[in-house]
Amino acid sequence: MPQKIVVVGAGPVGSLAALYAAVRGHDVEIYELRSDLRNSEHSSNISQSINLALSERGINSLRKTGLPDLADAVLAETFPMHGRMIHVRKHGQYVRQAQAYDAHGRNLLAMDRTGLNKTLLDHLNSMPNVTFFFHRKLVSVDFRKKLAWFENRTKTDPAKSDDIEVSFDLMIGADGAHSAVRYHLMKFVPMSYQQEYIDKLWCQFHVPPSDKGDFRIPPNYLHIWPQDDAMFIALPNLDKSFTSTLFLTRSGFEELVASGKVVEYFDEKFPGVVPELITEDELRKQFNEHDHFPLISIKCSPYHFGSTGVIVGDSAHAMVPFYGQGMNAGLEDVRVLFEILDKYPGDQAKALSEYSEQRTPDAQTINDLALGNYREMASDVKKPLYLLRKWIEEKLYIYVPSAGWATQYSRVTFSNMRYSEVQAAAQRQAKILNGIVGVTTLSLIGSAALWLGRTGGLQQAKQNILRSICLLAQQAQKVTKG
């Protein structure tokens, strides 16, 4: 039976939730605090956001809407990234090192968040059972009476701000990390809540195309300048520019603001950026004019109340951007939610309860993995032991497929396996991998004399490593299949 579904938040996650509901024949109303981002007047307010890395979970959620052209329309606006490109100095020389994302050649897709949002909104706009309400601020909700009150904040008539009463059968909160829906949900359900601002701020920079209209650096990579307590990244855009982001401690930003030595800092920490990618004047200008945003991590539980309210995306589990899964996880929330709602067509309360029970451990797992992945991106990627472990894992992935071996990264990024199950599998694999790394390290040491003493020694070392992997494959199979 068709219901009235109110979605609060018209970002990508809220828009996808509205599409899933509309395709099922429900009457959908979307309430958004801001103006319609498709209007030119809004463009100046949305220019700063960390670019998306769209991966399998997000793509799968787009395909499962029931709209055959949606995923293709989104994918047409993406740019493939084969792996990471690490920018470092070695022995005083600036070098770039490519690290593939996947042993089987699968890619991440760089995408502008606003472009994704516009595509979703355009599809919603063509559906007769969907109504938009922009400049509407949620001020109160009664989830028992199924009533909500919104303040009309239209710019055309600021004085006209009387609250508007709205009824609903189900409210879906997709209104971000500082969610008003979550705030009001807490009044009806004993919700556990944890919020953490990590000691990192971020600032966006724009790298324009070259004078010849081409990319300034190889385009099919996520470029990383790792510096332990700081990191600079760059993602490609379709117009051959890059969207770049500086991550730095709060005190680090304060020191740069006070000293004004942002160019000197980049020269020291991030080789090849100034003036090759950004001129000195433009770097100073963007650093001073662009906001320095905080990074927040949020966990809460449960995600619902009875049969009438549920939260998705950042409203439920805001995470730091270091695994590239925030948006993908939010889109996956929508798919999982509606699959469970379809499972219990006559019992919405049971469906929402199962959604909270299933999705909470998964969301909290990727939240933790995202926090931990900063170290990998900003530090580990330049260390020999990390590269050795990565090489071994990829060889196991290729040569022992019967063991079900896969890297944690590939399972997170290129599969739809539950995040909590990914972590459990990774922990089982780590037990055997630690042993393989130990054997491999001894093999490397034992082969060092051969490598130094005669031609072919390095190849012999690699053969010894692969032999060690094969000998341990049977044990790996037992462990990973648990």
UniProtKB/Swiss-Prot annotation:
Pfam families: FAD_binding_3 (PF01494). GO terms for molecular function: FAD binding; kynurenine 3-monooxygenase activity. It catalyses: L-kynurenine + NADPH + O2 + H(+) = 3-hydroxy-L-kynurenine + NADP(+) + H2O. Its cofactor is FAD. It is an enzyme of class 1 (oxidoreductase). The keyword Mitochondrion applies. Pathway: Cofactor biosynthesis; NAD(+) biosynthesis; quinolinate from L-kynurenine: step 1/3. GO terms for biological process: 'de novo' NAD biosynthetic process from L-tryptophan; anthranilate metabolic process; kynurenine metabolic process; L-tryptophan catabolic process; quinolinate biosynthetic process. Belongs to the aromatic-ring hydroxylase family. KMO subfamily. This is Kynurenine 3-monooxygenase.
